[in-house]
């Protein structure tokens, strides 16, 4: 399902410099290719992609970094060993345009979030 051109994802990406926007857009595109019936909303003040009405992830630009929020601390813990050298906290993965999150890790995050949402 295409996202709204004036929705929260497009609005956020429009204000991001081109280099960073390309990295964030790649994450959004991966979700759109993988997740059926993707939606969008604002959750915790972040533009958020949804699955079955629940937050699957947010990928945003901050002042000094890019960040991925999988809206689940257990997901970050599950992929932490594969993200050595990235700045991690309970619910956040910080990265940059120079060092994006590898696509296979994005795929794992998506799969883990979908599983958690499906299991309710």
Question: Whereabouts are the PLM-identified features?
Answer:
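Charge-dense, helix-prone N-terminal extensions
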Residues: 1-120
